[in-house]
UniProtKB/Swiss-Prot annotation:
GO terms for cellular component: cytoplasm. Belongs to the gamma-glutamyl phosphate reductase family. GO terms for molecular function: glutamate-5-semialdehyde dehydrogenase activity; NADP binding. InterPro entries: Ald_DH/histidinol_DH, Ald_DH_C, Ald_DH_N, Aldehyde_DH_dom, G-glutamylP_reductase_CS, Glu-5-SA_DH, GPR_dom. PROSITE patterns: PROA (PS01223). This is Gamma-glutamyl phosphate reductase. It comes from Helicobacter hepaticus (strain ATCC 51449 / 3B1).
Length: 412
């Protein structure tokens, strides 16, 4: 039985060791981690097969996120190498000045310390998060879902092999083995040892952590993302963007879950939009029975505007203009990613200014809300919080700062 407190004490100690490493030393370890993941690919895939063998009861979207193969494992290793190549400002001077007493004050970037990450079903998160935390000089403590337990253990063993090669403590990357709710409850109260907690997963997990954690949290909440098609939109562009935002990966948190359509486009554009969605086997959920009766087919239904479907299901609401669209997003959006398709520059700027979300798009798919697409290599999560980080969280989001003050005997 794992002693969580003992493990976290060692993790806290490891943070001091990790902070002393140079950027070049951290990069060398990351390269070794990538090599170990590739060399243990067969072992990792066998462990994943164990998880998949008891995953029949899971939704299809979750099973897809859970499944690994040799291509995905090699992609995980490549992602770690990409992270090693990224710039990291840890230990660098942000700014410096002299105060009226003659003190030299320097603001220096530093790691946060020990970062806990709670996540579900995606084994690649184990390697991505470990790499981002290690690159930024942070220790990470992982709490994966029980559905990916064997996969995560196998990946962790590969990472520990690399740490051992470089004479570093394995607690630089640790995992909470207790997969129960009681285990999560114990973990989220360990503020004595953990500096930041990042929960990423379903609404139930986020709410549980929010209401029980004593550790400061940055939440990766659900993605109820909208695409608003304004009356001035290039309609071919609108079709392409909507189809990409919904279909390129329906289970992603940055997938579109609701289309807002200006009412003047109903007669000329809605039939074409519905045809394209149905050709792709998308179920359309309408605002009320009248819309469903007039425009729906057998598989369609009534909208749930608060729901993250994570599937080939899409809410549709007709609005009378940008004010109603903005009001709808303000009420039902999850502060993740929102997009408008428009040729009207004034409307575009209004949307960008007034939508309260981590990522706000004009004439582009919400699917770009991703650490890799933003040039961060990967992401620890996509923050829907406003403090300390927002949007895709890369290396720089895992840093804080301290003030280094030099004097020559000043007293106050």
């Amino acid at each position: 039985m794992q002693d969580m407190v003992a493990m976290l004490i060692l993790a806290k100690r490891s943070a001091r060791i990790l902070e002393r490493l140079s950027n070049e030393e951290r990069n060398a370890v990351l390269e070794s981690m990538a090599d170990e993941i590739e060399s243990q690919c067969e072992i990792i895939c066998e462990a994943n097969a164990k998880d998949m063998s008891v995953a029949e009861h899971l939704p299809l979207a979750m099973r897809k996120r859970l499944e690994l193969n040799s291509i995905k494992v090699h992609s995980m290793a490549d992602s770690m190498r990409d992270i090693a190549k990224l710039h990291c400002s840890v230990g660098q001077v942000i700014k410096s000045w002299k105060n009226k007493a003659g003190l030299e004050i320097t603001q220096v970037s530093v790691p946060l310390g020990v970062i806990g990450v709670i996540y579900e079903s995606r084994p690649n998160v184990t390697s991505d998060v470990s790499a981002l935390c290690f690159k930024s000089g942070n220790v990470c403590v992982l709490k994966g879902g029980k559905e990916a337990f064997h996969s995560n253990v196998a990946i962790l063993k590969a990472l520990h092999s690399a740490l051992e090669q470089h004479s570093l403590p394995k607690e630089c990357v640790s995992m909470i083995e207790d997969t129960s709710r009681e285990g999560i409850l114990e973990f989220v109260k360990m503020d004595k040892y953990v500096d930041l907690l990042i929960p990423r997963g379903g609404e139930g997990l986020i709410e549980f952590v929010k209401h029980n954690a004593t550790i400061p949290i940055i939440k990766h909440d659900k993605g109820v993302c909208h695409t608003y098609i304004h009356k001035s939109a290039n309609l071919d562009m609108a079709l392409n963007v909507v189809l990409n935002a919904k279909l390129s990966y329906p289970a992603a948190c940055n997938a579109c879950e609701c289309i807002l359509l200006d009412e003047v486009l109903v007669e000329g554009f809605l039939p074409k939009l519905l045809t394209k969605l149905r050709e792709a086997d998308v179920r359309v959920m309408f605002e009320n029975e009248v819309w469903l009766k007039n425009w729906g087919i057998a598989d369609d239904g009534l909208a749930d505007f608060s729901k993250e479907w994570g599937d080939k299901i899409l809410n549709l609401k007709v609005v009378n203009g940008i004010d109603e669209a903005l009001e709808h997003i303000a009420h039902f959006g999850s502060a993740h990613s929102e997009s408008i398709i428009t040729q009207d520059e004034v409307i575009a700027q209004t949307f960008m200014r007034e939508v309260d979300a981590a990522c706000v798009y004009v004439n582009a798919s919400t699917r770009f809300s991703d650490g890799g697409e933003f040039g961060f290599g990967a992401e620890v999560g996509i923050s829907t919080s406003k403090l300390h980080a927002r949007g895709p969280m890369g290396i720089e989001s895992l840093l804080s700062y301290k003030y280094c003050i030099t004097g020559n005997g000043q007293v106050r």
